[in-house]
Design a protein with these regions (language model features):
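Short beta-strand and beta-hairpin "edge-sheet" elements
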Residues: 44, 113-159
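Extracellular/virion structural assembly segments
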Residues: 63-129, 159-164
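Compositionally biased, intrinsically disordered low-complexity regions
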Residues: 27-30, 36, 45, 107, ...
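Intrinsically disordered, low-complexity terminal/linker regions enriched in Pro/Ser/Gly
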Residues: 161-189
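Solvent-exposed edge beta-strands and adjacent loop segments
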Residues: 2-80, 132-145
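Short, low-complexity, polar/charged sequence segments that are solvent-exposed and flexible
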Residues: 98-104, 131-135, 153, 168-173
Length: 189
């Protein structure tokens, strides 16, 4: 038997995970020549972005065991968020427009990339592409207006890499590519 000895016990900080939202088509966003999508960092304005994987379980009891077993059967991820209503930020404007225009259904779906800045190869970082419905729970007045809500995942997340230099997400070969609500909506437009 061999033991792994870790000599570097660094802990990821909130600045080690970055979130980039697709803001293609948002008013005032200039598209980069040759790029399909335009992403912007959800940093300034965002005061909270908390992931809850929400593992769903199923309990099984066997007649020969006193203790039940719980198996993970699926996930229902969601992301609680708070951001200041900085209307000059395109990703904030995109979220605010959902509640302002009382959008429903596929019109509430946004795409964002979650990037692990501590997992880098060259200019690419390990990342997940997420399609999520935006549910705004409140617009609070605390001198500054604060948007509070939840992003609810729509389908499976797509694993891949995000090139910080080019702003391009590439799905990994082992991630099955399924059409999402957001992609269907974009194809209709």
């Amino acid at each position: 038997m061999s033991l792994f000895k870790c000599t570097n016990e660094a802990t990821a900080q909130r600045t080690d995970i970055a979130v980039y939202m697709d803001v293609t088509g948002v008013e005032g966003v200039t598209e980069v020549t040759g790029e399909e999508r335009v992403y912007t960092n959800c940093g300034t304005a965002w005061t909270s972005f908390t992931e809850s994987p929400n593992a769903q379980t199923k309990e099984r009891k066997f007649i020969n065991e006193k203790t039940a077993r719980n198996n993970i059967t699926r996930y229902a991820p969601q992301w609680a968020f708070e951001c200041l209503l900085m209307y000059n930020r395109p990703e904030v404007r995109k979220v605010y427009d959902i509640v302002k225009q009382r959008k429903v259904g596929s019109d509430t779906v946004v795409t964002f990339i979650v990037v692990d800045l501590f997992d880098k190869t060259g200019t690419k970082y390990a990342a997940r592409k997420v399609n999520a419905a935006v549910q705004i729970s409140s617009l609070d007045d605390d001198d500054d207006m604060i948007i509070k809500g939840t992003f609810y995942n729509q389908g499976d997340e797509i694993l891949g890499t995000f090139d910080m230099t080019e702003g391009v997400f590439t799905a990994s070969a082992e991630t099955p590519k399924e059409e999402s609500i957001a992609e269907n909506k974009q194809a209709e437009e």
